[in-house]
Every structure is written in structure tokens, then in C-alpha cells.
From Swiss-Prot:
Record has Oxidoreductase as a keyword: no
Predominant location category: secreted
Disulfide bonds: none
Species this chain originates from: Ascaris suum
Swiss-Prot/TrEMBL keywords: Amidation, Neuropeptide, Secreted
Protein name per Swiss-Prot or TrEMBL: FMRFamide-like neuropeptide AF9
One GO cellular component term: extracellular region
Modified residues (Phenylalanine amide): 9
Compartment(s) of residence: Secreted
Taxonomy of the source species: Eukaryota, Metazoa, Ecdysozoa, Nematoda, Chromadorea
GO biological process: neuropeptide signaling pathway
Family: Belongs to the FARP (FMRFamide related peptide) family.
Amino acid sequence: GLGPRPLRF
């Protein structure tokens, strides 16, 4: 899951 913030890695 991406969690609370969208990770852009």
C-alpha cells in the first residue's frame, strides 16, 4: 500500500 502519502519512487 502507498500509505497516507503517495510515494513516487
